[in-house]
């Protein structure tokens, strides 16, 4: 459960940072049209650098999380049996969905 909660929090932060960076770029292009707002442009460029630093930190955290999960499941005798079970469940649901749509036509 800890890994699921950590992953959810990480991806929420990731999308918030992406949204923040997107808004900063829009604001930058808005203020580039008005030469009287030079001071605002400097602040927005600083915001964009902060955005890039946050993205780098989140990508490091995400790769660290994936490595921890792989090491956690490699400790067991069966290795990646957990991932095989997940793949079987996904394929089973895809097959059920395909059969449902096939029965409609």
UniProtKB/Swiss-Prot annotation:
Instruction: Specify the superkingdom.
Output: Eukaryota
Q: Where does this chain mainly localize?
A: plastid
Q: Where in the cell?
A: Plastid
A single GO CC term, please? plastid
Q: Does the keyword Plastid apply?
A: yes
What keywords would UniProt list here? Plastid
Name of the protein this chain belongs to: Uncharacterized 13.3 kDa protein in rpl23-rpl2 intergenic region
Which organism was this protein described from? Euglena longa
């Amino acid at each position: 459960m800890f890994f699921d909660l950590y992953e959810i929090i990480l991806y929420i932060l990731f999308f918030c940072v992406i949204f923040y960076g997107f808004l900063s770029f829009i604001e930058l292009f808005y203020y580039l049209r008005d030469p009287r707002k030079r001071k605002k442009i400097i602040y927005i460029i600083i915001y964009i650098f902060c955005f890039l630093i946050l993205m780098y930190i989140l990508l490091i955290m995400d790769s660290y999380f994936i490595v921890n999960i792989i090491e956690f499941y490699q400790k067991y005798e069966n290795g990646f049996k957990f991932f095989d079970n997940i793949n079987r469940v996904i394929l089973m649901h895809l097959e059920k969905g395909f059969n449902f749509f096939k029965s409609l036509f």
